[in-house]
Amino acid sequence: GERGNNNKSQLIHGGMFFLKETENKNFNSYVIFPQCKKNSRWSNHQIDPWISSDSYDQTLLSDNSEILVQLIFSLINEYNIDPKRIYIMGLSMGGYGTFDLTSKRPDIFAGAISICGGANLSILDRAASVPHWIFHGELDRVVPVEKSRQAFELLSKLNSHHLYTEYKNTYHNSWENVFAEGDF
């Protein structure tokens, strides 16, 4: 996994996409890749991706997410970043964290991308104002594709500013397809 304290492992999947000098010239942006502490999560939940009754904390952010929120506001202040242009993206456990953060702190984010993640459907309605682009591989054996399908279905009923892309014949590594997307 990408957890730990080396400040490198979180760059394994997608890091080079954003770090390439040629890519950065196309975007006037700051990009951060926070690393989740070892043996912890981006959201406060006990996860069993194969059942629908994951146990979630309905209100509190995880310690990791609280630190991330503090970092975001610190960077906004220090670098004069437009607070209306803050976007979040996560894959796998980070996809869960993306949904959790947009559900509990929708005031922060202008948009979100969740790749092969899942959501707490009982509070996801709070994230409806944040446009989401949700990606998943149809053959994912780590996080069932149904998790993303359900999230998209719920969000779409509440607001039309959401996109869903499902990759045929693709397993958990759907981020490889995402980073190859022309529109991405």
Residue positions per predicted region:
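Active-site machinery of serine-nucleophile hydrolases
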Residues: E2-S65
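Gly/Ser-rich "nucleophile elbow"/oxyanion-hole loop immediately N-terminal to the catalytic nucleophile
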Residues: H45-S92
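Soluble non-cytosolic domains of exported or imported proteins
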Residues: Q58-E66, S103, V142-E146, W175-V178
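Primarily recognizes the serine-hydrolase "nucleophile elbow" in alpha/beta-hydrolase
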Residues: F73-N80, K84-R126
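C-terminal catalytic histidine-bearing segment of alpha/beta-hydrolase fold enzymes
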Residues: I115, S122-I123, P131-F135, L139-F184
